[in-house]
UniProtKB/Swiss-Prot annotation:
Compartment(s): Preautophagosomal structure membrane; Vacuole membrane
Lineage of origin: Eukaryota, Viridiplantae, Streptophyta, Embryophyta, Tracheophyta
Function, as annotated: The PI(3,5)P2 regulatory complex regulates both the synthesis and turnover of phosphatidylinositol 3,5-bisphosphate (PtdIns(3,5)P2). Required for autophagy.
UniProt family annotation: Belongs to the WD repeat PROPPIN family.
Bilayer topology term: Peripheral membrane protein
Signal peptide (from-to): none
Residue ranges of coiled coil: none
Gene3D superfamilies (UniProt xref): YVTN repeat-like/Quinoprotein amine dehydrogenase (2.130.10.10)
Assembly information from the UniProt record: Component of the PI(3,5)P2 regulatory complex at least composed of ATG18, SAC/FIG4, FAB1 and VAC14.
Protein name as catalogued: Autophagy-related protein 18b
Tissue: Expressed in roots, stems, flowers and leaves.
Disulfides per UniProt: none
GO cellular component: a single term: phagophore assembly site membrane
Domain-level remarks: The first protein part may form a beta-propeller domain involved in specific binding to phosphatidylinositol 3,5-bisphosphate (PIP2), leading to the association of the protein to the membrane.
């Protein structure tokens, strides 16, 4: 879930579902559910302002939290809502405002300022309470896979440490010291194998292997500080091919993880890799950074995901051969949906192509 921007914005919240096949947006008087593939408006409800609208894949179950602008829509009340009936299924009330909600087919996670609650989604029995450092932005990441189901939340307010918690086993997994300054963005791959982090400085993105927290790879987003708005891995059962990031600079950044890490692994076995210190050798080749400048107006909050990856194998093809094609969906907080194709050839040259763009406020049902 991407949270409210400090800048004026007609959109209150944006969220993609667990496989990025659908997304939800809300503003001052309603929320809408869209199909990511077709852009079709699937559901709309004019019932006031909501700060959280979380989907469960493409099912009819939503987790919604009001903005508090109406007495009936308290930010301390979580409503599990059925779109097929238009009625609430269950409600959970808390002492403080709900800042984030995550769920998969078995677990429901509710993030508050200094506590995070884990529930069984089917029975709503509380399974665990996690005490956290103050987390006013509700910063969190969740991997929906039942085999590698992890939650990541900040572990410090003074540096970029992240707590990784196993949501199925109900125990802390590890604590990762990722940055010197506090965290601004976290993402987990859908299979729970990799975690990406960005700090408030916003110049470096780091990727850690969750099972081996000390092993990291660094990608330079830019030279000057910038606010990272979103991080998202591409879909994969193993190592994701792409990590996507958006920032206050208005650019979209794509990092070729699989190519970069595989090349790093080969280099680490060489003599040069063996003599370089970790702080130098973990900085990956900037050639694996594919940036689209000025995709969004500077300062406009945006949220991007990699919806689909197509890989075309072939080692004897000409240099213009497209070896990877990524479909990137972007939502801006001034109300636009954009879809790009990022094509990367076997010489690691890239091309961004805008496939479609439309105003989310102008789409109606029917």
């Amino acid at each position: 879930m991407a949270n409210l921007s400090s800048l004026p914005s007609p959109i209150y919240c944006v969220s993609f579902n667990q496989d990025n096949s659908g997304f939800a947006i809300s503003w001052k008087d309603s929320f809408k559910i869209f199909d990511s593939t077709t852009g079709r408006l699937c559901y709309e409800r004019a019932a006031g302002a909501f700060v959280i609208v979380e989907m469960l894949y493409s099912s009819d179950l939503l987790a919604i939290v009001g903005a508090g602008e109406q007495a009936s829509l308290s930010p301390r009340r979580l409503c599990l809502f059925k779109t097929t009936t238009g009625l609430p299924l269950r409600e959970l009330n808390f002492l403080t405002s709900i800042l984030a909600v995550r769920m998969n087919k078995k677990r429901l996670v509710v993030v508050l300022l200094e506590k995070t609650f884990v529930y069984d989604l089917n029975t709503l029995v509380m399974l665990d309470t996690i005490d956290t450092v103050p987390n006013p932005k509700g910063l969190s990441a969740f991997s929906p896979s039942l085999e590698g189901c992890y939650l990541a939340v900040p572990a410090s307010t003074t540096k970029g440490s992240v707590l990784v918690y196993n949501v199925m086993d109900l125990q802390s997994h590890s604590e990762i010291d990722a940055h010197r300054s506090p965290l601004a963005a976290i993402a987990l791959s859908s299979n729970g194998m990799y975690i990406a982090t960005g700090s408030e400085q916003g110049t470096l993105i780091r990727v850690h292997l969750v099972s081996e927290a000390t092993k990291s790879y660094s990608f330079r987003r830019g030279t000057y500080p910038s606010t990272i708005y979103s991080l998202s891995f591409g879909p994969s059962t193993q190592l994701p091919d792409i990590l996507i990031a958006t920032s206050s600079s208005g650019s979209i950044h794509a990092f070729s993880l699989s190519l970069a890490i595989n090349q790093r692994s080969k280099r680490s076995t060489s003599f040069l890799g063996s003599v370089l210190p970790d702080s130098v050798s973990d900085a990956l080749d900037p050639a694996h950074h594919h940036v689209l400048q000025n995709a969004v107006s500077s300062g406009i909050r945006s949220y991007a995901v990699v919806r689909k990856i197509d890989k075309l194998e072939g080692t004897s093809s000409p240099s213009h051969f497209t070896s990877l094609r990524a479909t990137v969906s972007v939502i801006t907080y001034n109300g636009y949906f954009q879809e790009y194709t990022l094509s990367i050839n076997n010489k690691n040259e890239s091309l961004w192509t805008l496939e479609r763009e439309f105003n989310l406020f102008s789409i109606t049902t029917g």
